[in-house]
Amino acid sequence: IISSVMANDLSFTPNVTTEFRYFPESPAYDGQFEYFQPSIYFGGEGRWVSKDRKKRVRFEPFLRLDLQDDERTHFDIRELSYLQRFNDFDLLIGNAQIFWGVAESRNVVDVINQFDEVENSDETDKLGQPLFRFGKFTDIGRFEIYYLPYFRERTFPGKDGRQRGPLIDDLDN
């Protein structure tokens, strides 16, 4: 049972989407499916913020069911994190997507999260990364220290997937 104090600051926005990809060209490699790729996405965003706004919990589940590419059918917790703010520093613990990187001429190179290649090859979809983050505000800016307890493997399309290259990535072996 959620108390009325907590319920006032608790929200969840579900998202269910059907997707139909159409590829007008014939497959480039043997084993790829033909022209249509239907799938269903289930996800959402849950948030809880304390009344003093010093505590926050975020939850973003992700489930894709693809009818043709088994590697694209997957579940991930993109975010399940707890943030505690103190006077001039904060602590983030959990699974999170961090938008932080090094600027290059073309774009920002993300150095924390792996990209979810089975979703898109444009490097916009990220996998959640287990981490601890300590952040401190100073007069000259903000400083952050990250601890990543382990490395998430990048995901790739399977042999049936249309957005794969000539070599098949077999990460199961």
Give each language-model segment a name.
Residues 1-9, 160:
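Cleavable N-terminal export/targeting peptides
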Residues 8-26, 55-59:
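Transmembrane beta-strand segments of Gram-negative outer membrane beta-barrel proteins
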